[in-house]
Amino acid sequence: MRIREIEPIVLTSKEKGSATWASIMIVTRVITENGEVGYGEAVPTLRVISVYNAIKQVSKAYIGKEVEEVEKNYHEWYKQDFYLARSFESATAVSAIDIASWDIIGKELGAPIHKLLGGKTRDRVPVYANGWYQDCVTPEEFAEKAKDVVKMGYKALKFDPFGPYYDWIDERGLREAEERVKAVREAVGDNVDILIEHHGRFNANSAIMIAKRLEKYNPGFMEEPVHHEDVIGLRKYKASTHLRVALGERLISEKETAFYVEEGLVNILQPDLTNIGGVTVGRSVIKIAEANDVEVAFHNAFGSIQNAVEIQLSAVTQNLYLLENFYDWFPQWKRDLVYNETPVEGGHVKVPYKPGLGVSINEKIIEQLRAEPIPLDVIEEPVWVVKGTWKNYGV
C-alpha cells in the first residue's frame, strides 16, 4: 500500500496537565492510497511549530512509498537529511510517521504490533507512576501524594526532589532533596521502588554529592544525573557510585544509543519511540540493550498514542524493567483520545490485542481539539518540570 497523505495535527485544550507540554499533542495521521489510516505521535516540548513543519518536510520523502517498507523508508530519510542524527525535529517527525506506518501494517494484517515483532513475552506490562507530584514542595506533601499513588496499585514511582536547583546544588538543596526522598521512602515502605529524576541538569560533582546523600534510601535508579551531553561527567559519575543510571529519552539514533550501552554508561535504557525512530529503530535498540545486559524502561510521558505503542513494544521486550506511566495524570482529553486503552491494575497494564497500536482513535476528539500550531510560553518554571515543584521550602 502506497502512502497518499501525511498530516500533522496539533491538539490542545483548556484542560491542562501536570507539566506545560502536557497541554498539547502533535498527532500524525498517515493515509494510504486504499484509505487505510494510521496514527503516530511526535514530541512537542517548546518546539511545536518547528516539529509541525518538520513533519510536513519529512512527509515529502514518504508520500508515494510503500507503507510496509518501514526500514527502507527510514533509511531513505536518513540518507536525505544530513542532520537527522543531530536534529530533534527531524527525529521526532520520522518517528511519528514510522509509528503510524506500523499501525497501518497491523491493521492490514489484522494483528497488534507486538505480534508483528515476534509475539509478546508477557501479558501484562509493569509500570511506574510519574506526574503524580504536581504542586508538591514540602516533604509532607510528597509523602501524602506518594501514599495515594501506592493505594492506586503502583509498585514503583518516580519524582524529582531537587526543586529549582540547576547545574550546581548547595547544602540547602541537598538537605531539601534528602528530606523529600526520606519522607517518600517512609510513606511507601521498602517494598515500593522509588526512582529519582534529575532531568539531566547537574554537573558531575553536584550529581555525585546527590548520589552519596540519597543512596541510603535505596533508589531503583538515578535518571539523567548529569547534563545529557556531558559524557566525561557521566563516566566520572559512574565511577563514583554503585547506583544504577537510567537515561535515553534524548537519544535520537540507533548508533548514539549503542555508544552509551556498549560503553557501559547506562544500566537502564529509556528510549522514547516518539524520537528514537519509532518502532523500526526502537526494536533495534531493545536488542542492543539486551545483548549488553541492560534493562529497558521506555520513556513515556507525552500522550496516549505514545502510551499505546510503548505498551506494544514493552510486551516484546525480554529485558524490560518497567514502563513509565503518566496515564493516570493525563488531562482527561488525552485519555478520551483513544478507545480500548487498558487501565493500571496492581501496578501493571494488560497488553491490548486490537490490530496495529492495540487501540482505536476517537476521531471526534481530534476534530474538536484541532488547533493551529502556536509557540508555548517560556516561563520561570521550565517546560519539563512537573508543575508547582520549582520551589524551595522553609527558610
Curated annotation (Swiss-Prot):
Q: What would be an example GO MF term here? A: gluconate dehydratase activity
Relay the pH-dependence remark from the record. Optimum pH is between 6.5 and 7.5.
**Broad EC category:** lyase
Entry keywords, A to Z: Carbohydrate metabolism, Lyase, Magnesium, Metal-binding
Q: Binding positions for Mg(2+)?
A: E197, E223, E249
InterPro entries (UniProt xref): DgoD-like, Enolase-like_C_sf, Enolase-like_N, Enolase_C-like, Gluconate_dehydratase, Mandelate_racemase_C, Mandelate_racemase_N_dom
Annotated site (Increases basicity of active site His): D272
Thermal dependence reads: Optimum temperature is between 80 and 100 degrees Celsius. At 80 degrees Celsius, the dehydratase is stable for over 2 hours, but at 90 degrees Celsius its activity is decreased to less than 50% in 2 hours and its half-life diminishes to 120 minutes. At 100 degrees Celsius, the enzyme has a half-life of less than 40 minutes. The activity is almost undetectable below 60 degrees Celsius.
EC code(s) of this entry: 4.2.1.140, 4.2.1.39, 4.2.1.6
- Details of cofactor binding: Binds 1 Mg(2+) ion per subunit. Can also use divalent metal ions such as Co(2+), Mn(2+) and Ni(2+).
Q: Where is this site: Transition state stabilizer?
A: E324
Q: Which residues form the active site?
A: H199, H299
Which SUPFAM superfamilies does the entry mention?
Answer: Enolase C-terminal domain-like (SSF51604), Enolase N-terminal domain-like (SSF54826)
Cite the annotated pathway. Answer: Carbohydrate acid metabolism; D-gluconate degradation
List other remarks: D-gluconate dehydratase activity is lost after incubation with phosphatase, whereas no such decrease in activity is observed when the enzymes are incubated in the same reaction mixtures without phosphatase. Analysis of the amino acid sequence of D-gluconate dehydratase indicate the presence of several putative phosphorylation sites on serine, threonine and tyrosine residues.
Subunit comment for this entry? Monomer or homooctamer.
Family in the record: Belongs to the mandelate racemase/muconate lactonizing enzyme family. GaD subfamily.
Tell me the protein's name. D-gluconate/D-galactonate dehydratase
Starting at the broadest rank, the lineage of the source organism is: Archaea, Thermoproteota, Thermoprotei, Sulfolobales, Sulfolobaceae
